[in-house]
Curated annotation (Swiss-Prot):
Single Gene Ontology MF annotation: protein phosphatase regulator activity
Entry similarity comment: Belongs to the phosphatase 2A regulatory subunit B56 family.
Database matches in Gene3D superfamilies: Leucine-rich Repeat Variant
One GO-annotated biological process of the protein: negative regulation of innate immune response
Phenotype when the gene is knocked out: No visible phenotype under normal growth conditions.
Organism: Arabidopsis thaliana
Protein name: Serine/threonine protein phosphatase 2A 59 kDa regulatory subunit B' zeta isoform
Record has Acetylation as a keyword: no
Lyase as UniProt keyword: no
Complex and partners: PP2A consists of a common heteromeric enzyme, composed of a catalytic subunit (subunits C), a constant regulatory subunit (subunit A), and a variety of regulatory subunits such as subunits B (the R2/B/PR55/B55, R3/B''/PR72/PR130/PR59 and R5/B'/B56 families).
Gene designation: B'ZETA
Expression across tissues: Expressed in roots, emerging lateral roots, cotyledons, leaves, floral stalks and flowers.
Length: 546
């Protein structure tokens, strides 16, 4: 009976081993601890069918089947698949007669027949249904879902090593159900904005009742001790990993969470793929920064990298330092950086904690991409700056303290009270206050004018109170230098007042000159905007003499 159901098994593939250099830098085990329990598989809900924007891309899933199935598809050309256009057949129906029916349960067959039944169920699940119409193929969809759930239990509890055929069929089934192209967005007219994201609901994957279970199967397979990495790398190869990375652009956060966990497991299990994974993530970042500024999975990719960076061996390789300089630091530039800033900040701080000499590079990078008109983004930059400074030693701080102090002074004088407050809070950090104290002769003259202007005229009372406290701290550090800075500030204020008065007198002369010329000639007079006071005086005397 079993032989009649299954028919012929696929041929054993030829071995094509791929050579790759061993990756360095392990994976932080704390990530596995927090993700050791897999996500529970929920029942199909009506919400999964609300968004059908991705359904069109899923219709092409059948084309992802390996070449071994091409002859089968060619024989069916011109014939309508079961259930009309709602079904994409990536392989032959596993049961005779072209009817999509459930195969026997694993509990109902002998142990010797379970491997064959496993292959049959995998082949059966290569049929992809269209979820854009939730009323079609309800019976077949439920049969496939129950079959997928059986495969989850089988993969999790299998008591022997997976062989070539099992790995080939499993990865083929995963590819058919998961790998797809997302609709391209109009990047020119729709740049990802955090404000827009608050108003718009993300598009959910319509086929999630099936897709979720397929992700669960892949996760159990990669994490299983019965999966031999040396054998599995022939099927979970560079192409497979790259297609997994492409799926991170999914709008469905549930899918990105599964991908994050699976890719982390792949990075930990397949050491041969580690350099390639890092390079592929780099390329995603480069394209995001330089071309699109639109990608849904940057935060998840950075979260994976945070754990990878934590496992880097010391001393850091030049490759890793270039990654920091060319990919991570420029990620502060896009307008939508607030979406992933928390994960980005964690990666940046990890690098500084690994190698304190990178602090100067990181701080100068932050100053390079410091926001000018986005106050909320500026507050986030100040928070990240504080975390970086906590890991910064005195020697590195001295290399960048002058431009850094100038930027902090600009933040202190910001009319946005949250920016000014966040800059003043830096003095509450003991380590940062010690760095300022050690270098107060350089820093105090730079920030003192900003503090004094806040004390005298900032519109926000809370900012004024915090400024007075910081002013007292500086006074306690060096009373003599404080008095010198105060005297210099007062002189500069007097000079500014005189310059302002002189400028007003200059404009008054211009107005008087224009008025007198108009009265005499009854014609408009064009006077250069920037005219020296000497020329103005000469012109006035000549006009008076005439």
């Amino acid at each position: 009976m079993i032989k009649q159901i299954f028919g012929k098994l696929p041929r054993k593939p030829s071995k094509s081993l791929q050579n790759d250099s061993n990756g360095e830098g392990g994976v932080n085990n704390s990530y596995y601890a927090s993700n050791s329990s897999t996500t529970s598989i929920s029942k199909p809900s009506s919400t999964s069918s609300k968004s059908s924007s991705a359904s069109g891309s899923r219709v092409a899933n059948g084309t992802l089947a390996p070449n071994s199935m091409s002859s089968n598809r060619n024989t069916n050309q011109g014939k309508k698949p079961l259930g009309g256009d709602a079904v994409v057949q990536a392989g032959p129906f596993p049961s005779s007669g072209g009817v999509y029916e459930a195969l026997p349960s694993f509990r109902d067959v002998p142990i010797s027949e379970k491997p064959n039944l496993f292959i049959g169920k995998l082949s059966m699940c290569c049929v992809v249904f269209d979820f854009s119409d939730p009323s079609k193929n309800l019976k077949e969809k439920e049969i496939k879902r129950q079959t997928l759930l059986e495969l989850v239990d089988y993969v999790a509890s299998v008591g022997f090593k997976f062989n070539d055929v099992s790995m080939q069929e499993l990865t083929k089934m995963v590819a058919v159900n998961l790998f797809r192209t997302f609709p391209s967005a109009n990047h020119e007219s729709k740049i990802l904005e955090i404000h827009d994201m608050d108003d718009e609901e993300p598009s959910l994957e319509p086929a999630w009742p099936h897709v979720q279970v397929v992700y669960e199967i892949l996760l159990r397979f990669v994490a299983s001790p019965m999966t031999d990495a040396k054998l599995a790398k022939r099927y979970i190869d560079h192409s497979f990993v790259l297609k997994l990375l492409d799926l991170f652009d999914s709008e469905d956060q549930r899918e990105r969470e599964y991908l994050k966990t699976i890719l982390h497991r792949v990075y930990g299990k397949f050491m041969v793929h580690r350099p390639y994974i890092r390079k592929a993530i780099n390329n995603i970042f480069y394209r995001f920064i330089s071309e699109t500024e639109k990608h849904n999975g940057i935060a998840e990719l950075l979260e994976i990298l945070g754990s990878i960076i934590n496992g880097f061996a010391l001393p850091l390789k030049e490759e890793h330092k270039l990654f920091l300089l060319r990919a991570l630091i420029p990620l502060h530039k896009p307008k939508c950086s607030s979406v992933y800033h928390q994960q980005l900040s964690y990666c940046i701080v990890q690098f500084v904690e690994k190698d304190f000499k990178l602090a100067d590079t990181v701080i100068r990078g932050l100053l390079k991409y410091w926001p000018v008109t986005n106050s909320s983004k500026e507050v986030m930059f100040l928070g990240e700056l504080e975390e970086v400074l906590e890991a910064t030693q005195a020697a590195e701080f001295q290399r960048c303290m002058v431009p850094l102090s100038r930027q902090i002074a600009r933040c202190l004088n910001s009319s946005h009270f949250q920016v000014a407050e966040r800059a003043l809070f830096l003095w509450n950090n003991d380590h940062i206050r010690n760095l300022i104290t050690q270098n107060h002769k350089v820093i105090m003259p730079i920030v003192f004018p900003a503090l004094e202007r806040n004390t005298r005229g900032h519109w926000n009372q809370a900012v004024q109170s915090l400024t007075i406290n910081v002013r007292k701290v500086l006074c306690e550090i060096d009373q003599v230098l404080f008095d010198e800075c105060l005297a210099k500030f007062q002189v500069e204020e007097v000079n500014k007042t005189e310059v302002k008065a002189k400028r007003e007198r200059t404009w008054q002369r211009l107005e008087d000159l224009a008025t007198s010329k108009t009265v005499v000639t009854n014609e408009a007079v064009l006077v250069p905007r920037f005219v020296s006071s000497v020329n103005l005086t000469t012109s006035s005397s000549e006009s008076t003499g005439s």
